[in-house]
């Protein structure tokens, strides 16, 4: 029960408050930890380049929208080179939805103040917000926190009841066997 209370507390802490930005907000999506950031490769048109160690960007006069489009293009190129063993999700009908998180993290721009284009945001939603943690958040967003907590409580209670029944059946069968042997 203590574990369930702690789990509920952690979920409450993880949920954004009404005044707080959502985890799917563009700025939040781009504000990943430095380990997840990578540099946009330098192109012939001399786009802004970031350095992983310092996070310093040069040639920042270029338009943010163009940088976002360049990043989206890099993501698509990376997706085309992905291994064929990678399974795409059933809802994905286009190449942009079948990107892997690792490829996107490798291509993320270092500058956290970038104003991304709509296409870039679509890529970020498909690539970064993927995996077990994001699926849990989506479940909470879809059904509500209390409904998900209720599902968890019911599931854990059902599991405990099943284990208790199995233990009691096992105990009764072994107890009768011991009595027979002793008589």
UniProtKB/Swiss-Prot annotation:
Keywords for the protein's UniProt record, in alphabetical order: Disulfide bond, Early protein, Glycoprotein, Host endoplasmic reticulum, Host membrane, Host-virus interaction, Immunoglobulin domain, Inhibition of host adaptive immune response by virus, Inhibition of host TAP by virus, Membrane, Signal, Transmembrane, Transmembrane helix, Viral immunoevasion
Entry-linked Pfam families: US6
A GO molecular-function descriptor: molecular sequestering activity
Lumenal topological domain residue ranges: 20-144
The keyword Disulfide bond is assigned to this record: yes
GO CC terms: host cell endoplasmic reticulum membrane; membrane
A GO biological-process term: symbiont-mediated suppression of host antigen processing and presentation of peptide antigen via MHC class I
Transmembrane segments: 145-165
Glycosylation sites: 52
Ranges facing Cytoplasmic side: 166-183
Biological role: Inhibits peptide loading of MHC class I molecules by transporters associated with antigen processing (TAP). Does not prevent peptide binding to TAP, but binds to the lumenal side of the TAP complex and inhibits peptide translocation by specifically blocking ATP-binding to TAP1, but not TAP2. Also prevents the conformational rearrangement of TAP induced by peptide binding. In consequence, infected cells are masked for immune recognition by cytotoxic T-lymphocytes.
Subunit structure and binding partners: Interacts with UL18.
Comment field on protein domains: The ER-lumenal domain is responsible for TAP inhibition. It is sufficient to inhibit ATP binding to TAP.
Record family assignment: Belongs to the cytomegalovirus US6 family.
Protein name per Swiss-Prot or TrEMBL: Unique short US6 glycoprotein
Organism encoding this protein: Human cytomegalovirus (strain AD169) (HHV-5)
Lineage: Viruses, Duplodnaviria, Heunggongvirae, Peploviricota, Herviviricetes
């Amino acid at each position: 029960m203590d574990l369930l209370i702690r789990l509920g507390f952690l979920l409450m802490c993880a949920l954004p408050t009404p005044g707080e930005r959502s985890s799917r907000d563009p700025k939040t999506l781009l504000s990943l930890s430095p380990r997840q950031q990578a540099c946009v490769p330098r192109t012939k048109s001399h786009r802004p380049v970031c350095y992983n160690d310092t996070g310093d960007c040069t040639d920042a006069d270029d338009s943010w929208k163009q940088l976002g489009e360049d990043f989206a293009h890099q993501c698509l190129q990376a997706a085309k080179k992905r291994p064929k063993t990678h399974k795409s999700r059933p809802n994905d009908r286009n190449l942009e939805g079948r990107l892997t998180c690792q490829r996107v993290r490798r291509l993320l721009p270092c500058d956290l103040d970038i104003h991304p284009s709509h296409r870039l945001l679509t890529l970020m939603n498909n690539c970064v917000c993927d995996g077990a943690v994001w699926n849990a958040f989506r479940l909470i967003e879809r059904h509500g926190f209390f409904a998900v907590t209720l599902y968890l409580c019911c599931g854990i209670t059902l599991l405990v009841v099943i284990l208790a029944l199995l233990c009691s059946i096992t105990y009764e069968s072994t107890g009768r066997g011991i009595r027979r042997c002793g008589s």
